């Protein structure tokens, strides 16, 4: 697996809309190890990370995580292991100008057998289960992180709000998150979870739309002697 370690440094004076800071090039996968954001403005800035999944929607970004504040002359280090595939984009939205952002990342060949992958999507279904991720035939998925954000404008209350793992062979399921999800709040699941071929991660939220990002590894399922 060819690896190239790189960084980027950029500034922006754009306020009120997301600005693309990094796009994954063709034939590559990009994995961030850390991002630093410095506020050069005299006022406190509120920022929001945006992601674009080119395979899902080439024009609309999703909000990744909650917004955060940085006081004047201070920096914030973000250690999220964000993954971008070919054509995917990382952006930032700020309400103040004079913002400086840098990031460290590794570029990998996307043709490798073990692939680092990313899905971001906007879900417009409410009160019904939606497939967020499914392990394809002949492959195993190792899910590293799932973030779901309520962007409906309304608090989603009650135990009908649920994330669950569905096992393909018997169609049995196990909920791993359930309960209220207030407007502009997130559910952040970081426990490693393995999906065998056909297994699914599903969500049901009582309000819509909501934003979902998932980072995972996908690898061929090896044949095991005696199995």
Which residues make up each language-model segment?
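Short connector loops at helix/strand junctions that flank enzyme active sites
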Residues: 30, 44, 85-87, 141-143, ...
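Low-complexity, intrinsically disordered tandem-repeat tracts enriched in small residues
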Residues: 24-26, 76, 83, 130, ...
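Extracytoplasmic low-complexity repetitive segments enriched in small/polar residues
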Residues: 44, 60, 100, 106, ...
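Intrinsically disordered, low-complexity repeat tracts enriched in Pro/Ser/Thr
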Residues: 18, 22, 47, 54, ...
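Intrinsically disordered, low-complexity Pro/Gly/Ser/Thr-rich segments with frequent PxxP/GP/PP motifs
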Residues: 55-87, 170-200
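C-terminal interaction-tip segments
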Residues: 1-30, 34, 38-40, 55, ...
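Short, surface-exposed beta-strand/strand-loop-strand elements in extracellular ectodomains
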Residues: 42-66, 153-177
């Amino acid at each position: 697996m060819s690896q190239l370690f790189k960084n980027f440094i950029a500034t922006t004076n754009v306020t009120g809309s997301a600005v693309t800071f990094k796009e994954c090039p063709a034939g590559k996968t990009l994995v961030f190890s850390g991002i630093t954001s410095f506020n050069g403005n005299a006022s406190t800035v509120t920022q929001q990370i945006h992601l674009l999944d080119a395979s899902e929607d080439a024009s609309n970004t999703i909000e990744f995580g909650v917004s955060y504040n940085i006081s004047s002359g201070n920096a914030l280090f973000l250690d999220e292991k964000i993954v971008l595939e070919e054509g995917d984009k990382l952006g930032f939205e700020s309400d103040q100008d004079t913002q400086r952002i840098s990031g460290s990342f590794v570029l990998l060949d996307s043709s490798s057998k073990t692939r680092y992958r990313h899905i971001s999507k906007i879900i417009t279904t409410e009160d019904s289960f939606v497939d967020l991720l499914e392990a394809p035939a002949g492959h195993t998925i190792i899910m590293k992180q799932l973030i779901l954000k309520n962007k409906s404008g309304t608090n989603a209350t009650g135990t009908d709000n649920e994330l669950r793992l569905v096992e393909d062979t018997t169609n049995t399921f196990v909920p791993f998150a359930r309960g209220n999800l207030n407007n502009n709040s997130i559910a952040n699941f970081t426990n490693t979870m393995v999906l065998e071929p056909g297994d699914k991660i599903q969500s049901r939220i009582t309000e819509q739309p909501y934003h979902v990002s998932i980072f995972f590894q996908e690898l061929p399922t090896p044949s095991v002697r005696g199995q």
